[in-house]
From Swiss-Prot:
The name this protein goes by in its record: Gag polyprotein
Domain notes: Late-budding domains (L domains) are short sequence motifs essential for viral particle budding. They recruit proteins of the host ESCRT machinery (Endosomal Sorting Complex Required for Transport) or ESCRT-associated proteins. p6-gag contains two L domains: a PTAP/PSAP motif, which interacts with the UEV domain of TSG101 and a LYPX(n)L motif which interacts with PDCD6IP/AIP1.
Species of origin: Human immunodeficiency virus type 1 group O (isolate ANT70)
Zinc finger (CCHC-type): 394-411, 415-432
Location of the region described as Interaction with host AP3D1 in the Swiss-Prot/TrEMBL record: 12-19
């Protein structure tokens, strides 16, 4: 109890004992309430020593406040006691617990407003056009670009030349810069003078277009008013730093000359990128053994340098990415369908062209060939000697089904000969329906004769004897009675030739 009682001493303890528990109540806070609060905090796994300071009380209130909606009356009483103790530590004059809660809400509300105003101020300061900064007197002054930024820009141009990634590099380093700073960055480049000359031509064209679309006002300017910027003023050749700052930061109709000049530079950089990257997106094709990931990297790097709108680039991606892939990847990509994402494509084509993919393709090809030749050898390997090639489907002698031979048949093995069904011999030695030759041997299975035998039986060319006799009888019926001896004349020998 001594440790708990040491939370408040002296005048703070006197102020604590003058606060009522409820408005209009006679009961007031006592030392026993501090002891009870300490024990409750230990029960809730909180540190009771936090009650000794105002900051500790705020931490306890922040931790207990989320549980008030679903907490018990004991938790609500603990939270009220800590609020009153927080007011005592801060020496706020309160009369009861309700006033302490109202005081806490007022203080927390004012803190939130101050934090919001501070964030708004910092956001406005961050939104100012750096390197245009405000000095102590509130005037807008220019802060020169740092040597580190120039060094990073020069090193990027030397290493990357004018690859597509040089454009976002320029945009990042020249953020908020005025025309004077941008010209400093361009003058720091030692090489690539031909490319810089192309850039200057683009800047001159854009300056002429600006003068055409923004003609200067007719007549003299009012006193104290600065002139409107021309194309050469935006390029920084005929304007000073103070004029550029004034055009950018003036309250009425500001003109961000630095941002406009950056857009002109980007147009020139796009032409330079196209000049240094002459490869067309149509020429980017995946090699036979090139991984799909490397092909995608080359494709998008070239697409980045293309001078086209985003809609055209999307069409190129949807069409050419699949069309220029190698046959293996193209077959996989077409099976995914037209709505597949790039992530799905890269996952599906992962490993294509490598040893694992080659082994899988070879295994699939062998499985297909084995399925076509299921049941044994082809007819070419089954022929023996001069026997003709067997055509048609293969038929099993064991079960009688087509598509496999008896060697690979899964049906139970049939006993005996597969042709006649008798036991004691095999089908190749079966004599059922066979004819023996003059040596007493049977013809080979299949019914065909050896190669040195005539494969087809010989048929006589003369007409049969029955047809000859029948023809002579018909001829006798047609003859007259005078021909008693038809065989005695020459006509019987030569027919109608006499």
């Amino acid at each position: 109890m001594g440790a708990s009682a040491s939370v408040l001493t002296g005048s703070k303890l006197d102020a604590w004992e003058q606060i009522r528990l409820k408005p209009g109540s006679k009961k007031k806070y006592r030392l026993k309430h501090l002891v009870w609060a300490s024990r409750e905090l230990e029960r809730f796994a909180c540190n009771p020593e936090l009650l000794e300071t105002a900051e500790g009380n705020e931490k306890l209130l922040q931790q207990l406040e989320p549980a008030l909606k679903t907490g018990s009356d004991s938790l609500q009483s603990l939270w009220n006691a800590i609020v009153v103790l927080w007011c005592v530590h801060n020496r706020y004059k309160i009369g009861d617990t309700q006033q302490a809660i109202q005081k806490l809400k007022e203080v927390m509300g004012s803190r939130k407003s101050a934090d919001a105003a501070k964030e708004d101020t910092s956001a406005r300061q961050a939104g100012q056009n750096y390197p245009i900064v405000s000095n102590a007197q509130g005037q807008m002054v220019h802060q020169a670009i740092s040597p580190r930024t120039l060094n990073a820009w020069v090193k990027a141009v030397e290493e990357k030349a004018f690859n597509p990634e040089i454009i976002p590099m320029f945009m990042a380093l020249s953020e908020g810069a005025i025309s004077y700073d941008i010209n400093t960055m361009l003058n720091a480049i030692g090489g690539h003078q031909g490319a810089l000359q192309v850039l200057k031509e683009v800047i001159n064209e854009e300056a002429v277009e600006w003068d055409r679309t923004h003609p200067p006002p007719v007549g003299p300017l009012p006193p104290g008013q600065i002139r409107e910027p021309t194309g050469s003023d935006i390029a920084g050749t005929t304007s000073t730093q103070q004029e550029q700052i004034h055009w950018t930061t003036r309250p009425n109709q500001p003109i961000p000359v630095g941002d406009i000049y950056r857009k002109w530079i980007v147009l020139g950089l796009n032409k330079m990128v196209k000049m240094y990257s002459p490869v067309s997106i149509l020429d980017i094709k995946q090699g036979p053994k090139e991984p799909f990931r490397d092909y995608v990297d080359r494709f998008y790097k070239t697409l980045r340098a293309e001078q086209a709108t985003q809609e055209v680039k999307n069409w190129m991606t949807e069409t050419l990415l699949v069309q220029n892939a190698n046959p293996d990847c193209k077959q996989i990509l077409k099976s995914l369908g037209p709505g597949a994402t790039l992530e799905e494509m890269m996952v599906a084509c992962q490993g294509v062209g490598g040893p694992t993919h080659k082994a899988r393709v070879l295994a699939e090809a062998m499985a297909t060939a084995q399925q076509d030749l299921k049941g044994g050898y082809t007819a070419v390997f089954m022929q023996r000697g001069q026997n003709p090639i067997r055509k048609g489907t293969i038929k099993c002698f064991n079960c009688g089904k087509e598509g496999h031979i008896a060697r690979n048949c899964r049906a139970p093995r049939k006993k005996g000969c597969w042709k006649c069904g008798q036991e004691g011999h095999q089908m190749k030695d079966c004599r059922n329906g066979k004819q023996a030759n003059f040596l007493g041997k049977y013809w080979p299975p299949g019914g065909t004769r050896p190669g040195n035998y005539v494969q087809r039986p010989a048929h006589p060319s003369a007409p049969p004897m029955e047809e000859e006799v029948k023809g002579q009888e018909n001829q006798e019926q047609k003859g007259g009675p005078n021909e008693l001896y038809p065989f005695a004349s020459l006509k019987s020998l030569f027919g109608t030739d006499q």
